[in-house]
């Protein structure tokens, strides 16, 4: 969607299907970086993605908008200026604008006039979108810019095709003659491509050959984006988080177990149902091999045979509530136990552990229904690693998780898989999950009534004395 008027490239364009005055999205946007050599078809790829995401608010940011304005001395020698070098861009302003868009703030992005080689301030703010596409030859070169992206794309097009497109674009749209274009290409464009642009291809998640002519690649990219847009923000950051598909039935069960007025009997019943779903989902992440069997009709059925070397490890007390569901799904499974004592807000002490002797050769389901700060989980996972369990063989199962706990685990153990049914908002000052469901173990095992009776008895004794 590249538009040029009097040599000025529009700094940021919003999908024609949505009004620019639409309110900013509440969820963190999905950021896509599209890089490639000059005239490789980056803009065409961006246009195709935007047209297929017509039901989403899409913002396109061009790296060309962030060129430095040239001084009089540089203007006099403009043909000696390398526009394809990283130093030609004002990356600090680019980073500032992208951070504001990602945080849901409107921002003024400059435009760049290629005829006078000056940056022009924008008078109208650009609102953020559900999807932000950052396009430019060097958007994958700077690690600070790469870190802002959820998906990185490199458009790979033949050098001869890129040169012919560049000649046509610069002569028709930017008022240059063919000789100057060829001189600039030989002196700056080609060397910069070899030194900076092509090496950045290694950072791309997806490489698109033939650019906009590759309809299959564009369709697959759009499908992936749509999937990510439906996910929680943390799932866009960490690929090892898996949330079971939310339905009205699952939402209804969450409503019941979170309700303070729910009886113990109902709490246990619906918690067990949710735990069973989480366990079943976790089993789907185990390795498998193809297996052929014969059915009672004499037909051959090609299916799969799941990993047999599996065990569970429950974090006492609340983790024990998940053992029955695991046993119901995996008959005869070995289950170990870990007891971790909380010393203070961020301290944990291992009190007890009893694990299968051959645990290092097994895949492990770590069981704890609530992931809060993540300190206990880190302690438990560290113990499993010390026993020789590969990090990639650990699947952490829980019902609800707080963002703080997810960050703590995923940053420390990137090969670990986390399977949960919902991600909650945050933690309060007492490190309890909000909105949460209270003390899970007390509600599940019925010990909250015992605690209240002990507290009441203690109060009565004090009053009598």
Swiss-Prot record:
Protein residues bound to GTP: 264, 273, 307-310, 362
Keyword annotations of the record: Allosteric enzyme, Glycosyltransferase, GTP-binding, Kinase, Multifunctional enzyme, Nucleotide-binding, Transferase
Biological process (GO), any one: UMP salvage
Pathway assigned in UniProt: Pyrimidine metabolism; UMP biosynthesis via salvage pathway; UMP from uracil: step 1/1; Pyrimidine metabolism; CTP biosynthesis via salvage pathway; CTP from cytidine: step 1/3; Pyrimidine metabolism; UMP biosynthesis via salvage pathway; UMP from uridine: step 1/1
Activity regulation remarks: Allosterically activated by GTP.
GO molecular function per UniProt: ATP binding; cytidine kinase activity; GTP binding; uracil phosphoribosyltransferase activity; uridine kinase activity
Similarity comment: family membership: In the N-terminal section; belongs to the uridine kinase family. In the C-terminal section; belongs to the UPRTase family.
UniProt name for this protein: Uridine kinase-like protein 5
Species annotation: Arabidopsis thaliana
Originating gene: UKL5
